[in-house]
Every structure is written in structure tokens, then in C-alpha cells.
Swiss-Prot record:
ATP binds at R114, K155, S160, S161, G162, K163, G164, Q165, E195, K196, M197, I198, E203. Pathway: Purine metabolism; IMP biosynthesis via de novo pathway; N(2)-formyl-N(1)-(5-phospho-D-ribosyl)glycinamide from N(1)-(5-phospho-D-ribosyl)glycinamide (formate route): step 1/1. Belongs to the PurK/PurT family. HAMAP family: PurT. It comes from Proteus mirabilis (strain HI4320). This is Formate-dependent phosphoribosylglycinamide formyltransferase. GO terms for cellular component: cytosol. Residues 119-308 form the ATP-grasp domain. It comes from the Bacteria.
Length: 399
């Protein structure tokens, strides 16, 4: 029997979030609904999840000693990584000494870079993937691109939100693609993956939950990416029964191998009835923000329920729904918004993340929509997102 304590009491159940972005904010909110004591950690102050946590810390999470000091001080019952740029060797050490890491330290370590999870999927689990090579320098990169053939894609083994990722259509693109890949990697990593570009029909995220009562799947989520980053998502994504069965089989094999309890975002390419494995995140997925409106239990609620050790039971999908990103371009440390009255129509919702600053393009929120069809839901979400404008509050006169 799992015992759940009350926040800010002697027997409080504590969850420490490593990475305090918009996805983590929703995880914290779900923990708060269960009376859990929450601690948010990130590399910068006033990150979204810090706004709703009981306490927060600002630290470089690649610094093992600094991170260990905070964890030792707080003694959380659950360590919940929200991002990849964490000292994973420390998580392994802590787990070996009895600390609960969500879903488990091995899953976090394997998925922190593209090489670990791609080799697991293709070489250990023998799942269908695009042809690929991992390389460390420009000469090897050029050779790999020619051998794999054009068009191909280059990605840093450690990056997120499409940083450093580009499509190479000919040898003329190689120099710029290599330079960009080196600028976009996390944690000083120069290694990249070069992979064949698959002519897929569409790509999906299959949110897969490993819980005490078995494996559960959400309905497939379709999404649109630009420059490797999510711009819109919708659920359910229509696909053949054969492809769906293959997708669920692949997702099951991956999450069962990774282990632990929690929600996993399994990214797949669909080509007719064929399914190719792409990547997996052992945590809620940005495309899954649509589940805030499309399901009775969002991906965040499912993640929390699973890692606490409680059964999922069932997941009810509520019809055609979509999300669209609010992605302005400006520079400000005092962001204000207009246009919400235009965006807030029937069957639309808004989530503003309260990010403290912006320099260039940055995802500041999403609009969620429910409609009678996926096409109309996408249109409604996009119209809502376009209506919301972000401004520098220091210079905006009509506040």
C-alpha cells in the first residue's frame, strides 16, 4: 500500500522536479492536486514551474556536486527529471543508494542523448529505424552524409527543440549544416547523428504509460514541426489499425526495456502501414500539451499517477482537439499580452507559461481547441494563437 503524506507536514510526500519549464509546471500542478510537497529546480530564476512549487532552487544541473547538495538537503521521495541536461551519473549513483528516480535512472541516462536510445532501439530491440551513423568530426560527418545519401538529417546527439538540427539536400549544404550542429548541442557535445530522411506520411507521438496495472496508451497525437520544434499538435491522429498495432508494439517494447513507472513520449514515423521508431522521452512530451483539453486525464496527470505507484485504470479521449503554439519574436524581461479576448472563444482555452524573458523567438504559451473535426480544431487553435500578441511591457503604451 502506497502512503501519501500531506505537504508541509512531517510525513509529507516530496517531489523534486529537475527542470522547471512549462511541462514541469503542469506536473507540479498535478502533484499539488494530491497534496504533495513540490520543489522545482532549474538553471534560471523564475522558470514556469517555480511559480507553482512550494520551493525552488537555481543551479546548473550538469554540476553534480551542486545538484547533489540540494537533493541531500531536501531528501525528496521522488526525483522527476523534466529535461535531458542533467548530471545523469549522479542520478544513477543516487538510485543505487535508494533514491527513487522517475521513471528510473537507466531510462533517463539512455535517453539523454540520441545515441543511447537509437542504439537500444535499432541494435538491441531490432526495431525499424532510418539508416544512421554517429560521427565526431567534420570529415567523418561529410563521409557519413555521402554514404547515407541525400536528403539526410543531422542532429546533435544532445539537443532539444530542434537546436542544431537541419536537412541536408546536397553536398553544398554540408558546411553550414555541420557548423549549425555544433552551435546547437547541449553540454558541450560535438557528436552528431546523420540519418536518412524517411519519406513518411506523417509523424506521431504515442504517449505510453508504464504503471502498476500494466501498459496504457493514449490515442495517437499528430503534430507539425518547424526547424525540429513543435508548432501544433492534434488528437486523435487517424491511422490504419495495422499501423496503430505496430506503433503500440514498438512503444511497449521500448518502455518495457527502459523500465520504471511513468509516462513516455514515443515518437514514430508512419509510412502507410509501416512504422519507424524515431525517439523517446521518459517524461511528458510537448506535443502532449493537447491532452490538457483532449483527455479526461492529461499526460501530466497520468505521469504523476504512474510514478506514485497508483493504477491508471482507463483513459477517455474527448474528441477532436488541437493545440497551437504562441511563438512571438521580441526582446523583453517584462512581457505583457494582448488579444486574449479575441482568442477566448467557445471551445478554446489558453495556457500562458509565464516565462520571465524572451530574446528572439520563444514558446510562451499554447491555445487549445475542441471542435467537430481535427481540421476545424487545428483551425480554431491556430486562430486563437494568432490573436494573442506579446509585447515588451516597458515600451507598450496601452497596458
Amino acid at each position: 500500500m502506497t502512503i501519501l503524506g500531506t505537504a508541509l507536514t512531517t510525513n509529507a510526500t516530496k517531489v523534486m522536479l529537475l527542470g522547471a519549464g512549462e511541462l514541469g509546471k503542469e506536473v507540479i500542478i498535478e502533484c499539488q492536486r494530491l497534496g504533495i510537497e513540490t520543489i522545482a529546480v532549474d538553471r534560471y530564476a523564475n522558470a514556469p514551474a517555480m511559480h507553482v512549487a512550494h520551493r525552488h532552487y537555481v543551479v546548473n544541473m550538469l554540476d553534480s556536486e551542486a545538484l547533489k547538495q540540494i537533493i541531500t538537503q531536501e531528501k525528496p521521495d521522488f526525483l522527476v527529471p523534466e529535461i535531458e541536461a542533467i548530471a545523469t551519473s549522479l542520478l544513477v549513483e543516487l538510485e543505487n543508494n535508494g533514491q527513487k528516480v522517475v521513471p528510473c535512472a537507466r531510462a533517463v541516462k539512455l535517453t539523454m542523448d540520441r545515441e543511447g536510445i537509437r542504439r537500444l532501439a535499432a541494435e538491441t530491440l531490432h526495431l525499424l529505424t532510418s539508416p544512421y551513423q554517429f560521427v565526431d568530426d567534420e570529415a567523418a560527418f561529410r563521409k557519413a552524409a555521402v554514404e547515407i545519401g541525400f536528403p539526410c538529417i543531422v542532429k546533435p546527439v544532445m539537443s532539444s527543440s530542434g537546436k542544431g538540427q537541419s536537412v541536408i539536400r546536397s553536398e553544398q549544404d554540408l558546411t553550414s549544416a555541420w557548423t549549425y550542429s555544433q552551435e546547437g548541442g547541449r553540454a558541450g557535445q560535438g557528436r552528431v547523428i546523420v540519418e536518412k530522411m524517411i519519406p513518411f506520411d506523417f509523424e506521431i507521438t504515442l504517449l505510453t504509460i508504464r504503471a502498476i496495472d500494466g501498459i496504457h496508451f493514449c490515442e495517437p497525437i499528430g503534430h507539425r514541426q518547424e526547424k525540429g520544434d513543435y508548432r501544433a499538435s492534434w488528437q486523435p491522429q487517424k491511422m490504419s489499425d495495422i499501423a496503430l498495432a505496430k506503433a503500440q508494439h514498438i512503444a511497449s517494447k521500448v518502455v518495457e526495456n527502459l523500465g520504471g513507472y511513468g509516462l513516455f513520449g514515443v515518437e514514430l514515423f508512419i509510412q502507410g502501414d509501416e512504422v519507424f521508431f524515431n525517439e523517446v522521452s521518459p517524461r511528458p512530451h510537448d506535443t502532449g500539451l493537447v491532452t490538457l483539453i483532449s483527455q479526461d486525464l492529461s499526460e501530466f496527470a497520468l505521469h504523476v499517477r504512474a510514478f506514485l505507484g497508483y493504477p491508471i485504470g482507463g483513459i477517455r479521449q474527448l474528441g477532436a482537439c488541437a493545440s497551437a503554439v504562441i511563438l512571438p519574436e521580441l526582446s523583453s524581461t517584462n512581457i505583457v499580452y494582448t488579444g486574449l479576448e479575441k482568442a477566448l472563444k467557445a471551445n478554446r482555452q489558453i495556457r500562458l507559461f509565464a516565462k520571465p524573458e524572451i530574446a528572439g523567438h520563444r514558446r510562451l504559451g499554447v491555445v487549445l481547441a475542441h471542435a467537430d473535426s481535427i481540421k476545424h480544431a487545428i483551425e480554431e487553435a491556430n486562430l486563437g494563437a494568432q490573436a494573442i500578441l506579446a509585447h515588451d511591457g516597458d515600451n507598450h503604451l496601452s497596458r
